[in-house]
Regions:
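Structural marker of alpha-solenoid helical repeat scaffolds
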Residues: 25, 59-60
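Non-heme Fe(II)/2-oxoglutarate
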Residues: 83-177
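Catalytic core of non-heme Fe(II) oxygenases with the double-stranded beta-helix
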Residues: 148-158, 162-218
Length: 218
């Protein structure tokens, strides 16, 4: 954290030395490599930033933090085609139509039950600084008992996850698929936005696959 603060204060040379020391202490710590690459990008050393990303990814293929930052660096270098090849949004971004569980009359009733459960959840917190939600509430884990209607949603999401992984399984050389886990665990949380509510730009570094389901919109 001190290293990041030094960078923000403009102490770039000291910050670079400190980053190198931090990486030397724990070469596997992805966040240190991302922050170092970010510093290099800020001071106009984009090629060095790319080198940091590529060297780490040789040892940790498919790491989401360095892969994501590598696309940013590539765009800064003007290599948009290579960046888009990694992102491959048309290939990896999929949509699924949520099916109505058997014990609900229709999908609207199911969504209403999910909304009601979320609004009454004891873990709802106002825009926690540890998360990306702003002007809204953010819940904790919704798959802990009592799950309520989220138990039915859990089964649906797991089936979609399995289908997604099977459909893309042949693309074994892409960084995203290199990081695909053998076993998958699902985590679900909810967000309730007010007027001007939004999410800060972010990724989920501990996750392989992320998705969103809008229960209710204005």
């Amino acid at each position: 954290n001190l290293v990041v603060v030094k960078g923000k204060l403009g102490e770039l040379e000291q910050s670079e030395i400190a980053f190198k020391q931090a990486i030397g202490i724990d070469p596997n710590y992805a966040k240190a490599h991302v922050n170092f690459a970010d510093l290099l990008l800020q001071i106009g050393q984009s090629k060095r930033a790319l080198q940091i990303c590529e060297e780490y990814l040789k040892q940790h293929p498919g790491n989401s933090e360095l892969t994501a930052f590598k696309t940013i660096v590539l765009h800064e270098l003007g290599d948009h085609l290579k960046a888009e090849k990694i992102l491959s949004i048309k290939n990896f971004l999929k949509t699924e139509k949520i099916k109505k569980p058997d014990n609900y009359r229709n999908i609207s009733d199911f969504n209403s039950a999910l909304v009601s459960h979320l609004r009454g959840h004891p873990t709802l917190t106002e825009a926690p600084q540890s998360h990306a939600t702003r002007n809204g509430q953010h819940s904790g884990e919704l798959l802990e008992s009592p799950k309520g209607p989220f138990g039915a949603l859990e089964g649906l999401l797991i089936s979609y996850m399995i289908k997604y992984k099977e459909e893309l399984g042949a693309q074994t050389e892409h960084p995203f698929m290199l990081a695909a886990p053998r076993k998958m665990k699902l985590s679900v949380w909810g967000v309730i936005m007010r007027q001007e509510g939004h999410q800060l730009p972010h990724i989920h570094p501990s996750a392989w696959l992320s998705g969103v389901y809008y229960l209710e919109v204005p």
